[in-house]
A protein has these predicted regions:
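Single conserved hydrophobic/aromatic residue that forms the stacking wall/gate
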Residues: 1-9, 13
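Short, charged beta-turn/beta-strand-edge "cap" motif at the junction between a beta-strand
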Residues: 69-74
Length: 149
């Protein structure tokens, strides 16, 4: 069933397109950070949206997403509030903090995301480096499908 209808969201979101997805290699942990309000941003590799066969449109302000856990269960609905594209080496400490991971520092963010993006790019013919364009996305939770304990 459609989460929007099954949770009484039909009237609010009926005409809104949305995507359903989980966060990287740790969907449960990162979804929990979203639910607790710690994680209010994410990042993705800009160039990978334009790969042949890629069907995901570039996120834009106002977009809705259903966040899934590792069992593909809906956790919450978020709305993108801001997107910016910057080179990997220029992702700000503010963005790293909003991502809510680890100690929330830029050094931690770079360490974890350098490995993550390098792995993603290894599956393509593209090269990942410090000048690779990163889509920084900020969002807010507009509906919680799962209560935080």
């Amino acid at each position: 069933r459609d989460l929007r209808m099954s949770r009484g969201l039909g009237d609010v979101y009926k005409r809104q397109p949305y995507k359903a997805w989980g966060f990287g290699d740790a969907p449960d942990q990162l979804a929990d950070l979203v639910l607790t309000g710690i994680k209010t941003a994410t990042a993705s590799a800009y160039d990978l949206y334009f790969m042949e066969g890629e069907e995901d449109p570039l996120p834009q302000s106002g977009d809705y997403s259903i966040i899934l856990n590792s069992k593909d269960e809906a956790v919450c609905v978020i709305q993108t509030t801001k997107t910016t594209v910057v080179p990997f080496d220029e992702v700000s400490k503010e963005h790293a903090y909003k991502e809510g991971e680890g100690d929330r520092s830029l050094a931690y963010w770079r360490d974890v995301h350098e490995d993550f993006f390098a792995e993603e790019f290894a599956e393509t013919e593209l090269e990942f480096n410090g000048q690779t364009s990163i889509l920084c996305e900020e969002f807010k939770v507009v509906y919680r499908a799962i209560d935080v304990n």
